[in-house]
Curated annotation (Swiss-Prot):
Subunit composition and interactions: Homodimer or homotetramer.
Protein name (record): Polyamine aminopropyltransferase 2
Subcellular locations according to the entry: Cytoplasm
UniProt-listed GO biological process terms: spermidine biosynthetic process
Main location: cytoplasm
Any Pfam family matching the protein: Spermine_synth
Classification via PROSITE patterns: PABS_2
């Protein structure tokens, strides 16, 4: 159950600006339109303050086990596969032979799960600033193959990792950091980050970036901001979008290409996907008129 309430309505039991109320029956998430989205809580799994952010894992009546970071919903067990399949597979299929993959933002490890479905993959480096998020998600939200022999995890600020990286170039990079422009991932949403990322890619490479909400007024600034930055660095930047049920929003992504000139799929779709297929791949790149107008495409 999700309720949308104006600020100040029913807040007497809320201990802070967001999160669980004192009864532990509802979780309050600030809505960018000025109100709140309120979720009915079935059980509280863990509340934890890391060095970087507040981590809440709760079981919601509607969405099941869900991850909140600093009061913002990140993922639910009911539909995480929609988000992660949309994030990973368009970029992976475009590259002719993705062997080395960089994942910026490991989180629950679901992107690692999707990447390893491609037999060409030899190495995955996953970078996340918050080791505790990764550990708690593995414990409470289901194991993912982050301990596969092809996977190496680095717990560091993503921008610092990119800046200091001197290893073999990457074929695919997946940028899946939190969508606020002022939180732990603020160093990623910068022109210098993507310029340096471009330098550590191979001659032929694909990059996918989660582009935040398409229509919500505040986060839309991030959507346009990211697109403008990517256009300054990559010769081809293609936006796409789809509806994420638990977000109650149209969510955007960008594929950026280096040394590849089109989105022609070069790999078959992995067999065990739940959402993404050929029809979906065609549909998501057909943006609604308001989005095309905002991006000038």
């Amino acid at each position: 159950m999700i309720l949308k309430l104006e600020v100040g309505v029913g807040l007497k039991n809320l201990n802070g600006k967001w999160g669980l109320d004192s009864s532990k029956e509802f979780y309050w998430e600030p809505d960018v339109e000025g109100g709140y989205r309120v979720y009915k809580v079935k059980s509280v799994i863990i509340e934890h303050q890391s060095l970087y952010q507040k981590i809440d894992i709760v079981e919601l009546e509607t969405w099941g086990k869900s991850l909140f970071l600093d009061g913002s919903l990140q993922s639910t067990e009911s539909d995480e596969f929609i988000y992660h399949e949309l994030l990973v597979h368009p970029a992976m299929r475009v590259h002719p032979s993705p062997k080395r993959v960089l994942i910026c933002g490991v989180g629950e490890g679901k992107s690692v799960r999707e990447v390893l479905k491609y037999p060409t993959v030899k190495e995955v480096i996953g970078v996340d600033i918050d080791k505790e998020v990764v550990a708690l998600c593995q414990k409470h939200l289901g194991k993912t193959p982050i301990d596969d022999k092809r996977v190496r995890l680095v717990y560091q600020d993503v921008a610092e990792f990119i800046k200091n990286y001197r290893g073999e170039p990457f074929d695919v990079a997946i940028v899946d950091v939190t969508d606020d422009l002022d939180g732990p991932a603020r160093s990623v949403h910068q022109l210098d980050f993507y310029k340096r990322l471009y330098e550590i890619l191979g001659e032929k490479a694909t990059v996918v970036v989660q582009g935040t909400s398409a229509f919500s007024k505040v986060k839309n600034v991030g959507f346009c901001h990211i697109y403008e930055i990517l256009k300054e660095v990559f010769p081809f930047v293609i936006p796409y979008a789809d509806y994420i049920p638990s977000f109650s929003d149209l969510w955007t992504f960008f594929v950026a290409l280096k040394g590849i000139k089109d989105l022609t799929p070069r790999h078959e779709i992995p067999r065990d996907l739940k959402y993404y297929d050929e029809y979906t791949n065609e549909r998501i790149f057909t943006l609604a008129k308001p989005l095309r107008e905002k991006l000038g495409v």
